[in-house]
Amino acid sequence: MAAPEPLSPAGGAGEEAPEEDEDEAEAEDPERPNAGAGGGRSGGGGSSVSGGGGGGGAGAGGCGGPGGALTRRAVTLRVLLKDALLEPGAGVLSIYYLGKKFLGDLQPDGRIMWQETGQTFNSPSAWATHCKKLVNPAKKSGCGWASVKYKGQKLDKYKATWLRLHQLHTPATAADESPASEGEEEELLMEEEEEDVLAGVSAEDKSRRPLGKSPSEPAHPEATTPGKRVDSKIRVPVRYCMLGSRDLARNPHTLVEVTSFAAINKFQPFNVAVSSNVLFLLDFHSHLTRSEVVGYLGGRWDVNSQMLTVLRAFPCRSRLGDAETAAAIEEEIYQSLFLRGLSLVGWYHSHPHSPALPSLQDIDAQMDYQLRLQGSSNGFQPCLALLCSPYYSGNPGPESKISPFWVMPPPEMLLVEFYKGSPDLVRLQEPWSQEHTYLDKLKISLASRTPKDQSLCHVLEQVCGVLKQGS
């Protein structure tokens, strides 16, 4: 057995992938002269270790008369209603986010009324941001057009349809603009996975799907024409703390430096042993193509010794765009895992011509996979990611660089931060009874459970300090 380097946490987006923060004015109308959307803003950030944010919106030009440039940011719900692509109705809009469902009414003027509270919102992004912040207070933007569904279909599709219908009347520069919102691809993937959870798909069933990339995802930018030597642009890794907020200028393929557990004064949460056969097959697979490769890792998790043993690699022998072949390969791998008595313990992929460091997109995916493998139980189930860089010019020699990484859960998962701003948050200063507030009750209840080696006053001071910071 060959043990890899100690695992390193990497910056990531937690539960959310990069997304767009759209700020649409209620009065926008592409048929009005000189109407246009505002410029971009940065999206949400995350923790200094692993948080990761969303992207900001793109600037948009005006779209007035016949010579005006048509842009996707000029499309609003009111425009889609006016052109009969949408119809107003009760409960026709929905958001699924981290196991929560929100329903909204589409009003004739293009506004959204949230059924639960009766609040109205001027745009999908405003509603999505509000709802997502209730579930995850650290959320900075809502990616409304990718998050909100109209009668089961994402609003992005209706926006794209509207743009296609109007491209015949626009200049070539406008026709070249992508109808899909930039930076939303990861958000779309994440929301599809959330829907699988809502539909009752178990972690075991989900293991049949590739952990690396969606089969329909286009080839990685590193893919090149066969027979040509690669002179790809060097992707310079950045430290997570230097990222700041993630806007549209931040490429999801931006590489992020990993940090050792020792550097952040934390113990490695589990030990890892990897079979040399796994490293051999991963290295071999990565050398065969100039494009990224993806595969599964099978092994066992020993709860008592906190040891994750990776015993076999299962390459996905399909192209990223070949969904039909991918489904058959996934089923074959699933059966192989089952027959060998192995569990799905992780995934691997390659960066052919870049350092063996995770990208923002990789980090987003890894965090989601960690949560998915853990499932609904409280038991800890690790998920390991391996990265191979076979042709990176910065490698010390001909030998490929193989690196493991694991994403440290972001601090917004702390309990106080998690519930902060939620509608069902207990207001500790309010009276619980005639004699006590909710805070008094909490102190009395915790007093009987204070650790023996710590003083009661010290523990309660710490608890109260945390509560004050979260209020």
Swiss-Prot record:
Residues spanned by motif JAMM motif: 349-362
Chain positions found as Phosphoserine: 8, 178, 181
UniProt biased composition (Acidic residues): 16-29, 182-197
CDD domains, sorted: MPN_2A_DUB
Catalytic EC class: hydrolase
InterPro entries xrefs: JAMM/MPN+_dom (IPR000555), JAMM_MPN+_peptidase_M67A (IPR050242), MPN (IPR037518), RAMA (IPR040843)
Molecular function per GO: metal ion binding; metal-dependent deubiquitinase activity; metallopeptidase activity; polyubiquitin modification-dependent protein binding
Post-translational modification, as annotated: Degraded following binding to N(6)-methyladenosine methylated DNA (m6A).
Cellular-component GO terms for this entry: BRCA1-A complex; BRISC complex
Superkingdom of the source species: Eukaryota
Modification type N-acetylalanine: residues: 2
Protein residues bound to DNA: 123, 125, 145
Domain statement: The RAMA domain recognizes and binds N(6)-methyladenosine methylation on DNA (m6A). The RAMA domain mediates interaction with histones. The two acidic regions inhibit DNA binding. The two acidic regions promotes histone interaction.
Subunit structure: Monomer. Mainly monomoric, but when binds to dsDNA, forms homotetramer assembled into two homodimers. May interact with histones; this interaction is facilitated by dsDNA binding.
Similarity comment: family membership: Belongs to the peptidase M67 family.
Function: Probable protease. Acts as a sensor of N(6)-methyladenosine methylation on DNA (m6A): recognizes and binds m6A DNA, leading to its degradation. Binds only double strand DNA (dsDNA) in a sequence-independent manner.
Name assigned to this protein: MPN domain-containing protein
Gene name of the record: MPND
